[in-house]
């Protein structure tokens, strides 16, 4: 439905922005405090099952290094929530 389409578009845009920040960090253009804040915020987004479902659908459209980064953060979140 339309609401789901809007949510998918919104979440996809957020992930694209995070991918850009990941790239900027990898080339030394992003302040470490800004990076840490982004990672913390991103891990919160990745704790939502709906967002994980969307990620599984859109992840092939991202660079492999970013996919690995996101998958690592998802695993960290799963470990955290199990403790």
Language-model segment annotations:
Residues 1-83:
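Amphipathic alpha-helical "stem/stalk" segments
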């Amino acid at each position: 439905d339309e609401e789901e389409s809007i949510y998918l578009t919104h979440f996809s845009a957020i992930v694209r922005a995070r991918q850009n920040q990941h790239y900027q960090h990898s080339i030394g253009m992003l302040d470490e405090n800004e990076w840490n804040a982004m990672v913390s915020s991103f891990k919160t987004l990745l704790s939502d099952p709906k967002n994980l479902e969307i990620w599984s659908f859109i992840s092939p459209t991202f660079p492999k290094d970013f996919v690995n980064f996101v998958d690592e953060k998802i695993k960290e979140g799963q470990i955290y929530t199990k403790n």
